[in-house]
Amino acid sequence: TRAVGYRDNSVAQMARRGRLDRVSHGVYRIPFMPGGQLGPYMEAALWPVGVRGVLSHETALDLWEVSDVNPAKIHITVPCAHRTQRKAPTSYVVHREDLDAGEISEIEGVPVATLERAIRDCAADGVGLDLIEQAVRNGRGRGLLTAEQAAALTSGFGLDRVATQRA
């Protein structure tokens, strides 16, 4: 808050006066501004205090709109070293992994794992092969994956025929 010219207690005062809505610890929004469809996802990315979470796994597949995956919870990846005293909301699944900068993208300002990374994470977590195949095929068809990426993703799952197809 100091970096933008506010005193430490200014945000709390604005929240008490109704000028800001407190979403969670350290996360506020302007009440008269629409949160948008991605609002809950940005809240999840901001939940881990001190670092920015990255939406990952099934949540990332859902945001990339490449498969019919329908995650029951929001998956967030934080660095391995990140620790917090706060318990994660029950609507979140927190994964600990040190992602490289090249494995992180953004969708409308929301940090999200790249499609390639999301597919790898989902496959490792046991997401159905039909959803993995659909994600690779649609990702390739939309230009979100190169032929090489698609081939590498599918070779270990017996889905080699998908890598060469462009939907």
Short names for language-model regions:
Residues 2-167:
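Short gly/ser-rich loop at a beta-strand->alpha-helix junction or flexible surface loop bordering the NTP-binding
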